[in-house]
Amino acid sequence: MTHQTHAYHMVNPSPWPLTGALSALLMTSGLAMWFHFNSVTLLTLGLTTNMLTMYQWWRDIIRESTFQGHHTPTVQKGLRYGMILFIISEVLFFTGFFWAFYHSSLAPTPELGGCWPPTGISPLNPLEVPLLNTSVLLASGVSITWAHHSLMEGNRNHMLQALFITIALGVYFTLLQASEYYEAPFTISDGIYGSTFFVATGFHGLHVIIGSTFLIVCFFRQLKFHFTSNHHFGFEAAAWYWHFVDVVWLFLYVSIYWWGS
């Protein structure tokens, strides 16, 4: 093994950025094929490639951070900056969706009947499933904070319990959202209301699924004693991401479900 006189991690050549880019191309093309031609072959191929890429890329990172010891405090600091920038980019994504929603709703065009919601649209009741979803996500925010505090205090059992509760609440939220979509009296093709509603809430739902997957990985890593009270960036990143998902939902609830109805 060569002697290293700096704190940085010199990453080995990896195929995963290439396969990740390929999977993104397949997924976006597959989504267009699904919407226009009702064919899910390309989308399924893209999702499969994406899942395999993520699994193997994260496996490599976990190996580098644990067994190979490449994640020095300096490297961890760089990863933290990276996660913060990633969350900022996600904020800008949602800013675009909120912009589209408010641009359409604050000054409805004559084609929409000059009113919001547009003529013929029956909006969902914000005091039913959406309010329950809000409670579920707020509760999950409390449980992820409990998990973080338990980890800092070295209480492994409480950390696992809190993490399991957070994952269960995330899955419950996803199931509630799926049932709401199934029963909604409008679709994504119902003009600007359907488009902005399903794109904004659907993109958020995708983030909940990604966040739940992130937390499930952390749960299994904690079972294998990967985290300590002073070295647990993987969990910290998952917690930051989950709080971001939480805050975005509050804005979605107030804007689209409550004010927009």
Curated annotation (Swiss-Prot):
Q: Does the keyword Mitochondrion apply?
A: yes
Biological process (GO) annotations held by this record are: mitochondrial electron transport, cytochrome c to oxygen; respiratory chain complex IV assembly
Q: Which reaction does it catalyse?
A: 4 Fe(II)-[cytochrome c] + O2 + 8 H(+)(in) = 4 Fe(III)-[cytochrome c] + 2 H2O + 4 H(+)(out)
| PROSITE patterns in the cross-refs | COX3
Protein name (Swiss-Prot/TrEMBL): Cytochrome c oxidase subunit 3
Q: Which gene encodes it?
A: MT-CO3
**Localization per record:** Mitochondrion inner membrane
Molecular function (GO) terms listed?
cytochrome-c oxidase activity
Subunit: Component of the cytochrome c oxidase (complex IV, CIV), a multisubunit enzyme composed of 14 subunits. The complex is composed of a catalytic core of 3 subunits MT-CO1, MT-CO2 and MT-CO3, encoded in the mitochondrial DNA, and 11 supernumerary subunits COX4I, COX5A, COX5B, COX6A, COX6B, COX6C, COX7A, COX7B, COX7C, COX8 and NDUFA4, which are encoded in the nuclear genome.
**Enzyme Commission number(s) from the entry:** 7.1.1.9
Membrane-crossing segments per the record: 16-34, 41-66, 73-105, 129-152, 156-183, 191-223, 233-256
Mitochondrial matrix topological intervals: 1-15, 67-72, 153-155, 224-232
Keywords in alphabetical order, please: Membrane, Mitochondrion, Mitochondrion inner membrane, Translocase, Transmembrane, Transmembrane helix
Entry GO terms, CC: mitochondrial inner membrane; respiratory chain complex IV
**Origin superkingdom:** Eukaryota
Q: Which InterPro entries match?
A: Cyt_c/ubiquinol_Oxase_su3 (IPR024791), Cyt_c_oxase_su3_dom (IPR033945), Cyt_c_oxidase-like_su3 (IPR000298), Cyt_c_oxidase_su3-like_sf (IPR035973), Cyt_c_oxidase_su3_a-hlx (IPR013833)
Q: Which residues lie on this side of the membrane: Mitochondrial intermembrane?
A: 35-40, 106-128, 184-190, 257-261
Q: How does it sit in the membrane?
A: Multi-pass membrane protein
Quote the function comment for this protein: Component of the cytochrome c oxidase, the last enzyme in the mitochondrial electron transport chain which drives oxidative phosphorylation. The respiratory chain contains 3 multisubunit complexes succinate dehydrogenase (complex II, CII), ubiquinol-cytochrome c oxidoreductase (cytochrome b-c1 complex, complex III, CIII) and cytochrome c oxidase (complex IV, CIV), that cooperate to transfer electrons derived from NADH and succinate to molecular oxygen, creating an electrochemical gradient over the inner membrane that drives transmembrane transport and the ATP synthase.
